[in-house]
């Protein structure tokens, strides 16, 4: 035993020494903001064209892989995920059903690398393979395309197929004739329908609307600027798109360069199009135009709703507009107003607010309006509004999340998918005649005996200011509150996004290996509505990471765990949450994982996807202070003992520029007074986590999984005695 301990100590010592000898060069830049001097020690790492920068990133990634290779069960997660996929047999995703009952979907068999596009004429029709992305550009080397979005025409005669690779959001869109499988020679290349507003077909199926980017250089600062909604007619030159909703086409609408003009979903029978100017505000400005006018080339968009109306999820229903209203409401109301004489502040209230339940989403059918509510973002319910009455619909089992699906306002067809932290998503069709939900799964229901002993406990803990923070606890029924449990705390807290329950196999595998998972629903998210979002927004952003700190202290106090058994995990904007929790309370956590994280928000405005409306702008003195306060990079201090940290990024990340995690890692390595590892791993074949083959995603997650178990002391993840140094 003494020999084993000695070898592990030697391993850590050599590890620490090796990393300290490969620090990044520092070329500081000093700037002054409203009288405050800010020193950016690693501004040089923002130059991704510099070979020295790329070589240092590659050397650190190689070093990280060397360290991870010492962990005996590094590959456990990816191997187990592939085993679970094999057990399931196949998976179905991105299902689209046309009004004439044609089914289009992506299907991946367990032995395949990526999903293919399939078609059926009706639920019980014969399955037909339409397209395999492996065949796209297969005459060229080093391509790895995945289908990330599909959109059939109204009659199902044609389908648009969006494909991307290596984490890029920009896609190639091709159009196929479903009957003949003929693919049009024209390819759209400056759009990203999986991320930006999808594809919306013309009534006559001769073309579609989509969002077009002004440049295909995703690293350009102007990449997300001056986007426009365009009309593409099949068979025409993709370079000659027809602008129908944009700053240039509609200057009178005063659309700014950093806003995204998009079309809302519509039905064939609708007489109008609704356009929305999308930014990162909770409520947005909308406009309306008749279909006839727009297709005749007219530009007479009329103002519809204003952000002050607090109207969301607008949908045309005959001569009315149905919407979710937050006006004078903390929990939302379901309302409608006349399309010819609209009044969003004084509408007809169909469903008044339900105390404690937030109205989230709805679908309109010819039989009524189905809608969902959530409590604390984790307890979902389903209702139907019909003939002026509001009635609950019994769910097959308690669910944390419900997704709604319908054919349109003139059809009865309505489906839901229920899921939870420990329940795999199942699909049900509502039978109007008997008022009941019947199973209609397209993916096999699989048995997971290794997850049968897992339970979920939804609790609230009191933050330092008295606010009640929802926390989802997921653990084995055999858990003991002895302070020894290895806890993984996941957290986000931005953009008003709710961390809704889903069947997270990563969580369940963590638990099956002896750990416990906590999801902290911190302020800045949408679990408790707009107020919750504004509680972790710009100047109030410190609540976001302090809620995480308070949740961690609660779990320690209640003997679920202890400081040396806690790992925190945050992805994307969740990087702010875990980064600032770590820099404010470095003593509280054993390990920190920042996955493609926002680590240097003070510099966000210089990137293609800067978010001044969510986090703040350096042009405003108050917001500058807020940005500096939430900046984890600028809160790293010399001589502080920081926890073990795993920092990941994607070289093709269009959401969070890769130099944010890179700079954070470089500064942490240079200033950390502890011998805890700081690992940087950049995926040179990926981006923000999506648009890559599943096995690649599993491998990336598996490395973070193994790192956390290693640091929390799991015996199966400790370096072996015969490890090569």
Q: Which positions does each model-derived feature cover?
A:
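Extracellular/periplasmic ectodomains of large secreted or surface enzymes and adhesion receptors
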Residues: 366, 386-387, 391-393, 409-415, ...
């Amino acid at each position: 035993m003494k020999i084993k301990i000695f070898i592990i100590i030697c391993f850590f010592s050599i590890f620490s020494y090796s990393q300290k000898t490969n620090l990044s060069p520092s070329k500081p830049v000093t700037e002054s903001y409203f009288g405050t001097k800010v020193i950016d020690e690693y501004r040089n790492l923002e130059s991704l064209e510099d070979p020295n920068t790329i070589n240092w990133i590659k050397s650190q990634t190689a070093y990280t892989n060397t360290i991870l290779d010492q962990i005996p069960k590094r590959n456990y997660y990816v191997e187990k995920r592939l085993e679970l996929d094999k057990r399931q047999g196949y998976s179905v995703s991105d299902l689209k059903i046309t009004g004439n009952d044609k089914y289009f979907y992506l299907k991946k068999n367990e032995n395949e690398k990526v999903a293919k596009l399939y078609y059926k004429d009706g639920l019980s029709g014969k399955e037909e393979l339409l397209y395999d992305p492996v065949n796209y550009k297969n005459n060229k080397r080093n391509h790895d395309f995945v289908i990330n979005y599909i959109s059939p025409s109204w009659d199902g005669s044609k389908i648009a197929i969006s494909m991307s690779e290596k984490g890029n959001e920009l896609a190639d869109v091709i159009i196929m004739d479903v009957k003949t499988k003929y693919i049009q020679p024209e390819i759209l290349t400056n759009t990203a329908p999986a991320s930006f507003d999808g594809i919306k077909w013309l009534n006559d199926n001769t073309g579609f609307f989509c969002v077009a980017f002004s440049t295909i250089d995703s690293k350009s600062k102007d990449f997300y600027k001056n986007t426009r909604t365009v009309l593409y007619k099949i068979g025409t030159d993709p370079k000659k798109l027809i602008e129908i909703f944009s700053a240039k086409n509609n200057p009178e609408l005063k659309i700014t360069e950093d806003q995204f003009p998009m079309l809302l979903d519509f039905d064939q029978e609708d007489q109008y199009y609704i356009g929305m100017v999308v930014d990162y505000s909770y409520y947005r400005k909308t406009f309306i135009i008749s279909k006839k006018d727009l297709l005749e080339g007219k530009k007479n968009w009329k103002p519809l709703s204003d952000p002050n109306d607090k109207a969301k999820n607008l949908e045309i229903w005959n001569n009315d507009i149905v919407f979710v209203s937050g006006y004078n409401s903390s929990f939302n109301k379901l309302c409608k107003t006349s399309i010819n004489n609209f009044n969003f502040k004084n509408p007809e209230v169909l469903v008044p607010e339900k105390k404690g339940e937030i109205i989230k989403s709805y679908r309109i059918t010819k039989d009524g309006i189905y809608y969902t509510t959530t409590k604390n973002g984790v307890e979902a319910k389903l209702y139907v509004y019909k003939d002026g009455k509001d009635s609950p619909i019994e769910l097959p089992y308690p669910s944390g999340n419900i997704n709604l699906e319908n054919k349109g306002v003139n059809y009865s067809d309505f489906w839901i998918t229920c899921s939870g932290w420990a329940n795999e998503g199942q699909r049900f069709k509502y039978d109007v005649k008997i008022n009941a939900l019947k199973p209609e799964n397209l993916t096999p229901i699989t048995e997971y005996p290794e997850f049968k002993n897992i339970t979920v406990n939804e609790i609230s803990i009191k933050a330092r200011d008295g606010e009640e923070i929802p926390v989802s606890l997921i653990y084995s029924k055999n858990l003991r509150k002895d302070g020894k449990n290895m806890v993984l705390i996941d957290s986000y807290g931005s953009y008003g996004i709710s961390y809704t329950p889903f069947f997270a196999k990563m969580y369940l595998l963590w638990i099956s290996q002896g750990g416990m998972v906590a999801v902290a629903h911190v302020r800045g998210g949408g679990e408790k509505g707009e107020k919750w979002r504004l509680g972790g927004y710009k100047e109030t952003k410190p609540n976001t990471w302090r809620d995480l700190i308070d949740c961690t202290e609660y779990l320690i106090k209640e003997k679920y765990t202890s400081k040396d058994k806690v790992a925190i995990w945050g992805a994307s904007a969740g990087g702010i949450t875990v980064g600032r929790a770590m820099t404010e309370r470095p003593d509280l956590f054993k390990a920190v994982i920042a996955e493609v994280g926002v680590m240097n928000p003070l510099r966000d405005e210089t990137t293609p996807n800067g978010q001044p409306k969510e986090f703040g702008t350096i042009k405003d003195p108050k917001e500058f202070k807020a940005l500096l306060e939430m900046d984890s990079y600028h809160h790293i201090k010399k001589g502080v003992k920081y926890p073990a940290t795993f920092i990941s990024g994607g070289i093709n990340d269009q959401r969070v520029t890769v130099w944010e995690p890179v700079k954070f890692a470089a500064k942490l390595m240079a200033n950390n007074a502890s011998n805890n590892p700081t690992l940087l791993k950049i995926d040179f074949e990926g981006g923000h986590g999506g648009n890559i083959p599943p096995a690649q995603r599993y491998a990336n997650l598996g490395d973070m999984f193994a790192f956390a178990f290693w640091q929390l002391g799991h015996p199966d993840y400790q370096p072996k005695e015969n490890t090569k140094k």
